[in-house]
Amino acid sequence: MAHKKAGGSSRNGRDSESKRLGVKKFGGENVIAGNIIVRQRGTKWHPGANVGLGKDHTIFALTAGNVDFRKKANGRVYVSVMPKAEAAE
């Protein structure tokens, strides 16, 4: 026979789903137009040349090229896409 009454269930045991934020394409990586470079909350990284900023602060490529992260004098990190040099015709 049981000498202890059954314990209640724990009040813990819940967690939210991860949001998969962060850098998706790193410096020097090749991207095409539309590729997501960074997913973020707020602007930890700021948009530079040839990138767009989505309403959820996602930074994405507007042109094909290589990703470039630059820290400027104001302390902000800017993400740009450097277009590839076109082949001479």
From Swiss-Prot:
Positions of region (Disordered): 1-22
GO cellular-component term (any): cytosolic large ribosomal subunit
Domain of life: Bacteria
A Pfam family: Ribosomal_L27
The keyword Glycoprotein is assigned to this record: no
Stored InterPro entries: Ribosomal_bL27, Ribosomal_bL27_CS
Gene Ontology biological process terms in this record: translation
The entry's keywords: Ribonucleoprotein, Ribosomal protein
Molecular function via GO: structural constituent of ribosome
Signal peptide: none
PANTHER family: LARGE RIBOSOMAL SUBUNIT PROTEIN BL27M (PTHR15893:SF0), RIBOSOMAL PROTEIN L27 (PTHR15893)
Family label: Belongs to the bacterial ribosomal protein bL27 family.
Protein name as annotated: Large ribosomal subunit protein bL27
Organism, as annotated: Sinorhizobium medicae (strain WSM419)
Name of the gene this protein is made from: rpmA
